[in-house]
Amino acid sequence: INAGLVGSEMCIRDSNENGLLDYDNIEQIANLHSPKVIVAGASAYPRQINWLAFRQIADSVGAKLVVDMAHYSGLIAGRVYDSPLPYADVVTSTTHKTLRGPRGGMILWNKEEYTKKINSAIFPGTQGGPLMNIIAAKAQCYIEANTDEFKDYATQVVKNAQAMARQLEQYGIKVLTGGTDSHIILIDLSDSKYSGREAADILEKNGITC
């Protein structure tokens, strides 16, 4: 939860003992601090995020809602993960990761009042000359993401992750949240002889990136 675009800022990682987001507690925190902007998103949360709940929390305190969907954008394009676009004021994402595009990003918004501010903040604020090859690569990325083949791909990505989560549990490895709705699996290694870093190195050598 971001308490202001300029000024104090709070990062809230709120979940219950199962690792699931506790929206009631997030609402209590928002009511306590009255943020101007709430930023919702995750890099290590395997379940569906309730974007409507975040919208309602933001509205209850008069905050803007910004969503970072970088890790889920490909699954959202593939219609296997809920989209934040109907609920957020502004949405940001990378174009690589699950969207399979070139390294880069995008910003989406649904109100004309944001257009001038966002555009001027990007150029000339933070960006110089655009790379035309990257723009072309992004266009191709979006074309592919709008195909039935990409939807099939996204569906299979989630099925593969869910199958892996089940197998890990069968081998006695605790999977946080009890499974996954996405491409992300979180495991609890507190009772393991391996640290998180050691496990990540072993997995990377076998073609699985952590």
List the predicted regions and their residue ranges:
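Single conserved hydrophobic/aromatic residue that forms the stacking wall/gate
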Residues: 1-12
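Conserved acidic residues
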Residues: 9, 36, 89
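Active-site phosphate-binding strand-loop segment of PLP-dependent enzymes
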Residues: 15-69
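Active-site-proximal loop/turn and secondary-structure-junction residues that shape catalytic pockets
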Residues: 43-46, 71-73, 97, 181
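Glycine-rich ThDP/TPP pyrophosphate-binding loop and its adjacent helix/strand module
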Residues: 52, 56, 60-63, 167, ...
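Active-site C-terminal subdomain of aminotransferase-like
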Residues: 88-194
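Conserved PLP cofactor-binding pocket of PLP-dependent enzymes
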Residues: 205-210
